[in-house]
Regions:
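Carbohydrate-binding surface patches
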Residues: 80-123
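C-terminal beta-sandwich/jelly-roll accessory domains of carbohydrate-active enzymes
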Residues: 107-180
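Glycan-recognition surfaces
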Residues: 1-44
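Catalytic cores of secreted or luminal carbohydrate-active enzymes
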Residues: 26-78
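Conserved, mostly hydrophobic/aromatic
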Residues: 32, 100, 129
Length: 180
């Protein structure tokens, strides 16, 4: 098994040159964060909205790079098994910080909220849970953008964390957890 720091993960052009798939720029950036992170596209040929998102994606890379490079990786759910979503997280060695990536590959009508049981956290630590990158199409739940919760590690690992509702296919969100 290779560490995440050895995995090339880049934001590619869209539609993808290999499979022709159309995936939101945000999702491509969120997924690329759990690897070496980079861009494989001509920025002069992408929409201005995507160009405007690049500084934020690079800032997120710098913010989470040490965590991704040195943390422990946990695969929480696989699209290959559930045919709906992927979910994985990286937890720092001292268990004081984690980054969860949730990707809704395919949306389902009238689908109830998903509770994802997290892994690798300190059971007795209280974590500040921050849903990042929220917008009108990728909201952080019924309480609005940038909802913050305080939950214990044992609660997050045994009861789980409710994933935000998202409209459409190939949507993603990052959830940052910081021990208080």
């Amino acid at each position: 098994i290779y560490p995440l720091s050895a995995m090339g993960a880049h934001v590619s052009d869209c539609p993808n040159h290999t499979v022709g798939r159309v995936t939101p720029f945000k999702t491509r950036g969120d997924v690329a964060l759990c690897g070496t992170f980079g861009y494989e596209l001509d920025i002069t040929r992408i929409p201005q909205e995507d160009r405007d998102a690049i500084p934020g994606q690079i800032a997120a890379y710098h913010r989470y790079n040490d965590l991704v490079r040195n943390g422990d990786y946990y695969r929480l759910a696989s699209y290959q098994e559930n045919n709906i979503y992927d979910c994985y997280m990286v937890v720092s060695k001292d268990k004081k910080e984690a980054l969860l990536t949730y990707v809704q590959v395919l949306n389902r009508p009238n689908f109830k909220s998903r509770m994802i049981k997290l892994a690798g956290l300190a059971p007795d630590k209280k974590y500040k849970v921050l849903y990042e990158g929220a917008d009108e199409n990728n909201n952080s739940g019924s309480d609005g953008e940038n909802q913050v919760q305080m939950l214990y590690g044992d609660t997050l690992m045994s009861a789980g964390l409710r994933m935000p509702g998202m409209w459409g296919d190939f949507k993603s969100t990052l959830i940052h957890l910081v021990a208080e």
